[in-house]
Amino acid sequence: KFVAVDSAATLLNKIILEGSSTKADIILGLDMSLFDVANRSNLFAKHKVGNINKQIRLPIKWDSDKFIPYNYGYFAFVYNNKNLKKPPLSMNELINSTKARIVIQDPRTSTPGLGLLTWMKAIYGDNAGNEWKKLNKKIISVTKGWTDAYYNFFMSGEADIVLSYTTSPAAHIMFENNFDISASIFDEGNYISIEFAGILKTSKNKKIANDFLKFMLSDDFQSVIPSTNIMYPVTNINNLPDAFKNLEI
């Protein structure tokens, strides 16, 4: 049985509130911005999948004996290249130069929204608050989730730029043959997003849960990640759909 909620942050909060009374065996869909909170919650058991770093290929070393990564990507500001001829090429340009209308997601309820907080902090450190004040003048809406921001604001034309992922253009290419959507690759770098899964300590089905985590690293599971979750698989990136091959990152 699968139970879905509208965001990773909501999912983790739900599990924390349920505590030892939760009926969940596995939680999946968390990302790096929630890693520390999940790790400190003391709700997750060590997995029995073996040495993860021998089984996966990530841009960074994976350092956890509780959580299994299953896909990754990078946060980015996405725009229509037919409408926006001079997109921002850095966070500095986005904040200080662009006149474009921007839509982002609420960090309290959205993974990309929380990722942007971390991204800004990584770039600006203690000065992030001042940069946020300047960026806020360009933001026309802060939505609860990604779908509302992307489709109801960006794709409708109400916003020029939306917070999303570097892989978002691949979806438009694969499913619409639309090459008009691009992602800005920033000079400061684009912050990585790794999604992962973990087993709850209270699970009464730990063997089955561990078998499922192993399945998540199998070719059968990983091969459909690019076309379903529009992210990079963690085990083999050599057989990506053509739409992914021209992405900068």
Where do the language-model regions lie?
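Periplasmic-binding protein-like
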Residues: 56-57, 73, 133-136, 143-144, ...
